[in-house]
Regions:
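A short N-terminal beta-strand-loop micro-motif at the entrance of redox/enzyme domains
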Residues: 9-37, 42
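Glycine-rich beta-strand-centered segment in the early N-terminal region that forms part
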Residues: 26-38, 52-102, 107
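NAD(P)H dinucleotide-binding glycine-rich loop of Rossmann-like/cofactor-binding domains
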Residues: 94-174
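Conserved N-terminal Rossmann-fold NAD(P)-binding element of oxidoreductases
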Residues: 175-179
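N-terminal Rossmann-fold NAD(P) dinucleotide-binding loop
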Residues: 185-186
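Adenosine-nucleotide cofactor-binding segment
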Residues: 193-248
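Glycine-rich phosphate-binding loop and adjacent beta-alpha segment
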Residues: 250-318
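C-terminal hydrophobic helical "lid"/dimerization subdomain
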Residues: 293-372
Length: 372
């Protein structure tokens, strides 16, 4: 069986390559999954931007100098050498931008398993966990695309809100969110607006102001040029989804009472830069698995997941509520389509209302008989 891998140059994200590789025979205890479809958003660009810093490149090895960007989606077991996983099983999880992947399931339960590959053991467990769709509490039949697009983003959003609340928002009551039209930003805003006394300010481009205002999750929406509409002495926290160096400099310079700078993402991939020498607090990169691990230690895994899933059900219904859903889903199949959407999202383009679902395979037959 020949597999396709979508590769990205680690030091030049605009350079990509499609490589065909021959799938090796399975050894005992492994399974081969056909990756049916996956979402691609600015969150995945952030994985690539922080690929070395936060070890995102380490999950799925690639040839020297190249990386395989992790994505979230659904796959089907098409070949199994593991006694507890049958062909045809539908699995949610963290995959490479490929047609197939081989995993080494361990700690297999009714709910799912962890990939026990040696190279993944030092990495955060939350990314190594795979769920059987048939019993997954997040999963709703017919909502797979919404789940793939928003589930990992909402988990990050929930944990950002939880982390800041856990820190009493560092004494701030004004929360500045960049790239306010991004899905992770507005998921975070939905959670933050439930906190009493918080001024949740969405910052976006002029073209996206109307969209952000239509969401109803921000106290107010401003363009990047309108920072002067927020009091310079406001006790504030900057929650950065853009990674724009000029914007960060402007915020640190204007807000003398900036309490915390929380870097979550990098939707403005071409406008990154150094934060050295800025006034105010040091930039703190938010790593969702670290907050998840803290809460699992305090509440247990079931306690954490129960809280997130309950809020997820409310959020996903809100996003898809007629007659004006926040999200329109587009399907894209084949290498050329994947390359086009990758380039568009990397450049920060596209309609914020649109969510992209991708399949690298040219046809279902390329994935195997059991794939959907």
């Amino acid at each position: 069986m020949n597999d396709l891998d979508f590769l990205v140059r680690k030091d030049r994200l605009t350079e990509t390559e499609l490589r065909e590789v021959t799938g090796a025979p399975l050894t005992d205890g492994r399974v081969r999954l056909a990756i049916d479809r996956f979402s691609f958003t600015a969150n995945n660009v952030s994985y690539a931007a922080a690929g070395d810093t936060l070890n995102y490149w380490a999950f799925f090895p690639a040839p020297e100098g190249w990386g395989r960007i992790p994505v979230w989606g659904f796959a089907t077991v098409v070949e199994s050498a593991h006694p507890d996983l049958a062909t045809g099983e539908r699995i949610w999880g963290y995959y490479p931008m490929s047609t197939h992947v081989v995993l080494e399931p361990e700690r297999v339960s009714r709910h799912g398993f962890f990939d026990g590959a040696l190279h993944r053991k030092p990495l955060f467990a939350i990314y190594n966990q795979y769920s059987r769709c048939s019993v997954d509490s997040w999963h709703t039949d017919g909502w797979e695309d919404v789940e793939a697009l928003l589930r990992p983003l909402f988990a990050t959003s929930w944990l950002v809100d939880d982390f800041l609340a856990d820190q009493a928002f560092y004494g701030a009551d004004t929360l500045l969110l960049s790239s306010a039209s991004s899905k992770t930003a507005y998921g975070t805003a939905v959670q933050l607006r439930r906190r009493a006394g918080m001024d949740v300010v969405g910052l976006t481009s002029a073209a996206n102001v109307a969209f952000c205002e239509s969401l109803g999750c921000y106290s107010r929406v401003l363009t990047y040029a309108q920072l002067d509409r927020v009091a310079a002495d406001a006790a504030s926290v900057y929650i950065d989804f853009a990674g724009n160096a000029d914007l960060r400099s402007a915020i640190h310079t204007r807000f003398a009472n900036l309490k915390y700078d929380c870097a979550v993402g990098a939707t403005h991939i071409d406008q990154r830069g150094s934060a050295k020498g800025l006034p105010g607090p040091r930039v703190a990169f938010f790593f969702a698995p670290a907050q998840a691990a803290k809460r699992i230690g305090e509440w247990g895994e079931a306690g954490l997941m129960g809280r997130i899933v309950a809020d997820w059900k409310t959020f996903s219904r809100q996003v898809m509520s007629p007659p004006a859903p926040w999200l329109t889903i587009e399907q894209h199949r084949g290498p050329d389509a994947v390359q086009a959407i990758y380039a568009q999202v990397l450049a920060g383009g596209g309609d914020p209302r649109v969510g992209h679902m991708l399949t690298l395979a040219r046809s279902l037959s390329d994935l195997g008989d059991d794939a959907r």
